[in-house]
A protein has these predicted regions:
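Core nucleic-acid recognition elements
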Residues: 1-206
């Protein structure tokens, strides 16, 4: 079956960066934090997490270790939301999960996407490639380069548990600073603003 998500990435790399890739496959992953036994979840994978007509589903395992991906990818990049960032697909999956397992009322689900590359140019840097696939302000990415793929050392994200909320007294922030410091303020303050937006705030308070 055609992998639409993978094809979109492959075409964008060619259109935006003139990088030709033979094939890109994708994996939609779900991380579940709850009390439901893993065996019970495994029995309902095709009811909630995968479309059995066009997708392969598995539970309690990494899809990259299954025969479906036994053809030796050259680079693997996994992208998921950072802790505390709204994960709308995860919220939708949580709603469906609670319909199937209503007793697990505190369960939460986080999503991630893994991109699997074949026929990648030898001079294409895996970390640069990851930078084109995710927004570093709100997402995190793990990379398996050629060496890691050869060793079958696959990237695995953990559940993005938000840190404990601690009240912090309001603080004054000096916005008369260089661009690098503005970007650091946006990142550490979880503002998720790009540099142009930070410039607008800086100009507003001058």
């Amino acid at each position: 079956m055609r992998d639409v998500r993978g094809d979109v990435v492959r075409r964008q790399l060619k259109a935006d960066h003139n990088i030709s890739v033979a094939k890109v496959r994708s994996i939609c992953g779900y991380l579940i934090s709850g009390e439901t036994p893993s065996e019970a979840i495994a029995e309902r994978v095709d009811d909630l997490f995968a479309d059995p007509i066009i997708e392969l589903g598995a539970a309690n395992t990494t899809m990259l270790t299954t025969p479906s991906f036994g053809d030796g990818p050259e680079t693997v990049i996994t992208v998921g939301f950072k802790p505390g960032v709204t994960d709308n697909p995860g919220k939708a999956a949580t709603d469906g999960f609670l319909t199937l397992f209503p007793a697990d009322g505190d369960a939460k689900i986080a999503t991630y996407t893994t991109y699997v590359f074949y026929g990648l140019p030898a001079d294409c840097d895996a970390n640069w490639l990851a930078g084109t696939l995710h927004n570093g302000l709100i997402e995190r990415a793990l990379v398996a380069d050629r060496a890691a793929c050869a060793d079958q050392s696959w990237p695995e994200l953990t559940f993005p548990t938000p840190p404990e909320q601690v009240f912090i007294e309001p603080q004054s922030i000096d916005l008369e600073c260089d661009d690098a410091t503005l970007e650091e303020i946006s990142t550490t303050g979880l503002l998720a603003l790009n540099l142009n937006e930070m410039h607008a705030i800086q100009a507003h308070y001058r």
